[in-house]
Amino acid sequence: MLAFIQGELAEVKENYVVVDNNGMGYEIFIPHTVHSYLPAIGDKVKFHTYLQVREDGMALFGFLNREDLAMFKLLITVNGIGPKGAIGILSAISTDDLRFAVLAEDVKAISKAPGIGTKTASKLILELKDKFKLEDAFEATFQSNQVISTGGKGNNDGIREEAIQALVALGYSATDALKAVKAVEITSNMTSEDVLKFSLRNF
């Protein structure tokens, strides 16, 4: 219904902002992580939005990019997690880190979000883990470095998986291992040992 709202940033509070669009002020709930990316009061801003409609009223939830909105929509499909719970999760952990945590089945990382215990975190992982693939976590890396090995993306995925497993065996958490390996730019002649070596430099 409301795909996005664009206008002047009129007010900023801890949990929400007010956007002035043609004389109408829209109250939009946002993750805390958005605050550091907001423009100055009076400047133009655009939020990709989700409209919650309930018997007792409506509420708008907004994000600065479509990726965060997409993750929010996935989170509210999990039984027991509503829009405000999803906002709380995305206030505590970024979309990228949340994707890594789900792939790594890292209950501890997800349960750091306010109001999310280990039981809910486990349920979230169970219901969303099939929504992501390892290549999703590395998609930004593929797009940014434009390095394609002779074996293709699939071969790189195999090398990455071996490096991740090695890091976990060394005692690093699965989430930290995923993030460290993601930061490595892989070229066609690299082995999993090379990726492991460069990944260790990211700790």
From Swiss-Prot:
Annotated GO biological process: DNA recombination; DNA repair
Region (Flexible linker): 144-154
UniProt-listed NCBIfam families: ruvA
Keywords per UniProt: Cytoplasm, DNA damage, DNA recombination, DNA repair, DNA-binding
Principal cellular location given in the protein's record: cytoplasm
Compartments reported by the entry: Cytoplasm
Positions of region (Domain III): 155-203
Region (Domain I): 1-64
Official protein name in the record: Holliday junction branch migration complex subunit RuvA
Family per record: Belongs to the RuvA family.
SUPFAM superfamilies: DNA helicase RuvA subunit, C-terminal domain (SSF46929), Nucleic acid-binding proteins (SSF50249), RuvA domain 2-like (SSF47781)
Oligomer status and interactors: Homotetramer. Forms an RuvA(8)-RuvB(12)-Holliday junction (HJ) complex. HJ DNA is sandwiched between 2 RuvA tetramers; dsDNA enters through RuvA and exits via RuvB. An RuvB hexamer assembles on each DNA strand where it exits the tetramer. Each RuvB hexamer is contacted by two RuvA subunits (via domain III) on 2 adjacent RuvB subunits; this complex drives branch migration. In the full resolvosome a probable DNA-RuvA(4)-RuvB(12)-RuvC(2) complex forms which resolves the HJ.
Classification lineage: Bacteria, Bacillati, Bacillota, Clostridia, Lachnospirales
InterPro entries: DNA_helicase_Holl-junc_RuvA_I, Hlx-hairpin-Hlx_DNA-bd_motif, NA-bd_OB-fold, RuvA, RuvA_2-like, RuvA_C, RuvA_C_sf
Domain of life of the source: Bacteria
Keyword Phosphoprotein included in the entry's annotation: no
Pfam family, one: RuvA_N
Entry remark concerning the domains of this protein: Has three domains with a flexible linker between the domains II and III and assumes an 'L' shape. Domain III is highly mobile and contacts RuvB.
Coiled coil: none
Entry function: The RuvA-RuvB-RuvC complex processes Holliday junction (HJ) DNA during genetic recombination and DNA repair, while the RuvA-RuvB complex plays an important role in the rescue of blocked DNA replication forks via replication fork reversal (RFR). RuvA specifically binds to HJ cruciform DNA, conferring on it an open structure. The RuvB hexamer acts as an ATP-dependent pump, pulling dsDNA into and through the RuvAB complex. HJ branch migration allows RuvC to scan DNA until it finds its consensus sequence, where it cleaves and resolves the cruciform DNA.
